[in-house]
Amino acid sequence: MAKQNQDENLITLVDEQGNETLYQELFNFHSDDYDKSYILLIPAGSEPEEQVDVLAFAFNPDENDDSQDYELFDIESDEEWEMVEGVLDTFLNDENMR
């Protein structure tokens, strides 16, 4: 489960044991090919030039729901991972997108 804080696009991820970890949304996008939305997260408080692991998930945004809780889904296929990695590479290598 993810709980979103509107300030600075902070998201709290809760694991199976109930531990909460704070992340910041790097960006999100929708893929017409897979008809899914994706969100990429980095640890909150990371420095801009710091090398960090980026977490990626699929999610279903609900435009009519004001809830700040939503479900994240694992990306399961290799093809989806390749697409997400390609979008991330484009984001990281294009100064105009940051």
Curated annotation (Swiss-Prot):
Disulfide bonds: none annotated. It comes from the Bacteria. Signal peptide: none annotated. InterPro entries: UPF0473. Pfam families: DUF1292. Belongs to the UPF0473 family. This is UPF0473 protein LSL_1108. It comes from Ligilactobacillus salivarius (strain UCC118).
